[in-house]
Amino acid sequence: MAILSHTLGFPRVGLHRELKKAQESYWAGNISQQQLLETGRELRARHWQQQKDAGVDLLPVGDFAWYDHVLTTSLMLDNVPARHRSGANESDIDTLFRIGRGRAPTGEPAAAAEMTKWFNTNYHYMVPEFTLGQQFRLGWTQLLDEVDEALALGHRVKPVLLGPVSYLWLGKVKGEAFDRLSLLPALLPVYKQVLGELAKRGVDWVQIDEQALVLELPQAWREAYREAYQALQGQTKLLLTTYFDSIRHQLDIITALPVQGLHVDLVAGDDDLTELHRQLPAEWVLSAGVINGRNVWRADLQSWFEQLRPLLGKRELWLGSSCSLLHSPIDLSTETQLDEEVKSWFAFALQKCAELGLLRAALNAPDEANQARLGEYSAPIRARRHSSRVHNPEVKARLEKITAADSQRQQPYAARAALQRARFKLPAWPTTTIGSFPQTTEIRGLRLDFKRGRLDGGHYRTGISEHIKQAIVEQERLGLDVLVHGEAERNDMVEYFGEHLDGFVFTQNGWVQSYGSRCVKPPIIIGDISRPEAITIEWARYAQSLTAKPVKGMLTGPVTILCWSFPREDVSRKTIARQIALALRDEVADLEQAGIGVIQIDEPALREGLPLKHSAWQDYLTWAVEAFRLNAAVAQDDTQIHTHMCYCEFNDIMDSIAALDADVITIETSRSDMELLETFKEFDYPNEIGPGVYDIHSPNVPSEEWIVELLRKAAQRIPAERLWVNPDCGLKTRAWPETRQSLANMVTAARKLREEQP
C-alpha cells in the first residue's frame, strides 16, 4: 500500500499578500469585482501547483476564503443574517464582506457579525448566527466552483468541508434561546447535497473537518456525530479530520462512525500511533499529521520515520500536515536576511510540503539512500540543541531566583485605588483609548524608509515625534481623560517588542492571516529572552512632556507575546512566558522612573492560550496569571496598571481575570452587545473595567445614543464609579475621519452620563 501525502489547507494570502492588497483595493473602489475574483483564481492555481511540485499527492480545495472559511460555509448554507441581505435573496461576495466588515461596495451597511478566535490560534473566524426554526439551503457555491477549477487544471483534489457538528458548535444563538444542536436535521440535507455534487464530479475523498472532536464535548454533542454521519455516508469517502489536540477520549464515538479515514494531529496532541492503529477499523485510512502546520520549525523527519515505520504494510497510511498550513508563512527561500544557521532550523509552508514528500518517499522505499536523506535533513535540528544562540545562562539564573513575593503588589486594590484617585483626579466615566491611532501611509513610509536606510535616525525621530505630538493634540481637542502616544513607532504590538528583546528573530515575508485582509508577521522565539536596553521610555517620556493629563505607557504582555510569536519547542510555554515577564518587568520599573503613572500591559491573547481541553485549563491559567503579575507587580501602588483583552469570552475564567489584579481592565464587548457583562450577574469583579463601547473592526461610526445605551447597560452590572469609557480595541487599522467622529461621540456620551449623576 503506497503512502500518500496531503495538506489540510494552504495559506491564502499569497507570498506578497496579493489577496490582502486586492481585497483592500476592491473595498476602496480602485479595482472591479472581476479583478478581485481574478486575483483569487490566480492565487489558487499557483498554490495548487506549488503544493503538487513540492510533493503533495492530494491537493486541498475549498481551503481558500475571501474573508474566512467559516463565513464561506455560512454562505454555502445560506445562513445570512437578514441585516446583511440588503434586499437580495442570492448571496454574492459583497454579502460576505458585509457580514465580515459591516459594509461592502454594494448594499446597505449593517453591524458586522461577531468575530472570535479560531480554537487556540491567532486566526479569527466570523461567528455563525442561528435563530429558532432556521432553515438552510445550498446558496454560495464557491466550493463546487473551485473544485471545477482544480479538476480543469488536472489536479487530484481533496475538497475541504467544515463538518456540520463543528459548524453548529462554532455558532451562537440570536434572539429567542434554543439548543442550536436542534438545527442539525435541517442542516444535513444541504451537506448531503454538497457531497452529492462532489460525487458527480468524480471526487473520491472529502476532508470533512470536525475540530470540535478534540474538545471535551457534552454527551449530546458526541451523540450528534452519529446522527450526522449516518446521514452523510455513501456518496464519497470521508476523511474525518481533527486537529489542534488529541482525540483518544473520543475514539469510542469516532470508531463507530461510517467514515473511511481519520486524520489525527500528532504534533499538538499526544495520541499514540500504535494505539490508534489498534483501535481504528482495519479498512480505514490513518492520516498522520506529522508536519507542524502552526509553527516554523524544521521537522525531525528521522524521528517520524522511526515512529511510522512499524505501521508499514499493516494499514493504509497517509502523511499530512498537523493542521492547515494557513497558520504558517509561505516560503522560506525568500528570506534572504536570516542568518544561515538560524534559517536552517526553519520550514515554511512550501518547505513543509517538501518535508511530506521526503518522508513519504522514505517510507515508500525505506532503503539506505532515502534514510540517509532524512538524516541529512534532520542534522540542523540536532545542532540547534547545543547552539549558543539558544541558551543564555544569565536568564536561567534569574528564573531560578523568582519568589512568590515577586508577583505581589504591595497593597490590595482598594488601597491602591485610593492612592490613584488622589494622584490623577479623574472624572466619573473616565475616557481613554486602547493605545494605537491610525497608521497612516506617512507613518508606515517613515518606518520603512528608516528600516531600509533611506532615512537617518535623527530625521526618523523627528518624524515620529511629530506624529506623537499630533496624537496628543487630537486627544486634547477631543477631551479624552487618559491619553496615549499613538504607537506611531510600532509596526505590530508583538513584533515591536520582539525586535528589542534578545531571543527573537524576524522574517521579511513571514506573513500569516489574522482575519479578513489583516495579516501579521509573527516573531520567532529561538532562544532565551532578555532585555538588553529600555524599549518604550523615550517616546513615553516625550508624549508625557506634551500634556498635563496622564499618558499611558504601553506594553504587550508576556502571554500575548508568547501566543502571537512562533515559540520554541524545546522548552515549556510557561518558561518562555516567565522569561518575557522578567524582561518587561524591568520596562515597567523604567517607565515609572520616567514619570509615567499609568501603564497598560495588553493581554488580548490570554484566553487564546487556554488548552482546548477544559481539564487542562487550571495549570495554564496558574502560570499565565503569574507571568502577568510578575511583569506588573514591580509597580508602586499609586501607579495604575491597565490591561486590555479583546475577541474574548471570559465568563468561565473570571476568577483568573480577577487574579491578574490589574487596576483597570478594558475588554471587547461591542460586537456581542455587552453579552460579556452577563457574567457580572454571578461574579462581583473587584476592580475597574472599561467595556468597549464601539467596534473598531468596522469603519461604521457609532452614534452617541448607541454608546450611552451600552454604558447604561454596563452600569446595571458594574458600579458606575468603577466604569471606564473606551473603544473595544486599538485604532491602528482605522482612518482619522471616522476615528475623530467615533471618539467625539464617545466623549460626548461620557459627559452626558456624568451630567445625569446626582
UniProtKB/Swiss-Prot annotation:
KW Ribosomal protein (keyword) present: no
Cited PANTHER family: 5-METHYLTETRAHYDROPTEROYLTRIGLUTAMATE--HOMOCYSTEINE METHYLTRANSFERASE
Enzymatic reactions: 5-methyltetrahydropteroyltri-L-glutamate + L-homocysteine = tetrahydropteroyltri-L-glutamate + L-methionine
Upper classification of the organism: Bacteria, Pseudomonadati, Pseudomonadota, Gammaproteobacteria, Enterobacterales
Gene: metE
Family: Belongs to the vitamin-B12 independent methionine synthase family.
Binding sites annotated in the UniProt record for L-methionine: I434, G435, S436, E487, D602
Name the UniProt record assigns to this protein: 5-methyltetrahydropteroyltriglutamate--homocysteine methyltransferase
Active site residues per record: H697
